[in-house]
Amino acid sequence: MSLATLAVTVLVLNASNLSTHKGILKGAAVDEASAAETRAPVVGPLDIDQTLAGTEPVFVSDYFSFIGADDKGHVAFAMDNDRSRNGSEFTADAHVVLHDEHLGWIAVSGAGSYENTKKELLRIPDSPNFKFYGDVNNGVILDSPHNGLKLSVAPMIERLSRPGIESVFSLGSAEATLKWRDRTIRGRVIYEYIFKKNLSPWYSLFSGLFYTDFQGLYLMTEDGGDFYFRASKGEAWSELGENVLGFQVLGGNSEVLKDLHIEVLERSYAFGFYRWPKTWRVSWRCKKGAGTLSAQVVDQITVTNWLIGGFAMGIVTGELSYDGTVRPIYGLAELIR
C-alpha cells in the first residue's frame, strides 16, 4: 500500500480533478454504490486545492506494483513514493523493489529519502535515479537509465475510491510494460494513491507502528487479470476505507469484492517478537457468485525490522477460482507487522 509501502511510482496529477471528483482517476469507481454499504457514510470530499493553499501538514503517496512475464519468466517491480509538508519542510522518500523469478531479489539504486527542492506534493519529484513523465490519467513513464529499467503505464482505470473529510484514497489498474536490461516484459500495474492532511510528522519514522498485521496482495492472473486485497487490524487509517477490502478485474469485468474473508493459514518465523503471514485462504462474492483464492509466499525480503514488528515484501503464487475457472496467480505481497 502506499505508506510504509513500496512499489512503483508516477504522476503529474491535475489538482482541479482531485478536488472535484470522488477519486483521482478517470471514470467512476466500479460498484461504488454497493461498496458503500459496507462502510459508514463520509462527509466531504476533501478540497485538495484549499488544503494545498493552507498550512496544515500534508502527506501524499503514490504506489505502483508491476507484475509481468516474458519467455524468461515473471518479473515484479514496485515503487512507493511519499511526499510530505510539515510547516516549511518538504520531504520525499522512495521505496523500491525488483524481483526476477529465477534470479531472486535484484538490487536497485534510488531507494531512500532525497531532496524535494521544488516543494512538490501532487507531482512526484524527480530524483537522481528516477525521472517521471506524464500523468496517471493519460499514461505515465518511470525511467531509470542508471538501473537499466523503464516502466510505461497505460492510462489508469479507477477500480475503487474512498473520499474522506481529510483524505483521498484511490485504487486503479492498467496495462504496463517494463523494459529491463535486454527484456521487454508486458504485464499489469495496480496503483494506490493517498492524499491525507494532518498526518503526524512522526509517520515516516514510525510508519510501521500505525499498522497492525497489515497484508496487501497485488496479483496478476495468468490470463492478464487483476486481483487485490488488503487487510489490517489497525484503526489509524480507517478513514481510507474498510480494514478489509479488495477488487478483481477478470475477463475485462471490474468488481469490488463483497463479503471478503481473509484467513492466514500459516506464519513464518521472523527475527523478533512476531511472525510473518505465509499462506492465505481468501473468499468473497461478486456478481457471478463466490470466489476463492489460495496463495503462499515463495520468496521474501525484510525491508525493516523493529524487533516488535517489521516491514517485508514477498513474491506470492497460488490459484484463484471464480465463475467455474481456475486461474494461476503471481504477484507481490506487502507485509507490515
PLM regions with names:
Residues 2-14:
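Hydrophobic membrane-insertion alpha-helices, especially the h-region
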Residues 14-337:
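Structured soluble/peripheral alpha/beta segments that form catalytic or ligand/cofactor-binding pockets
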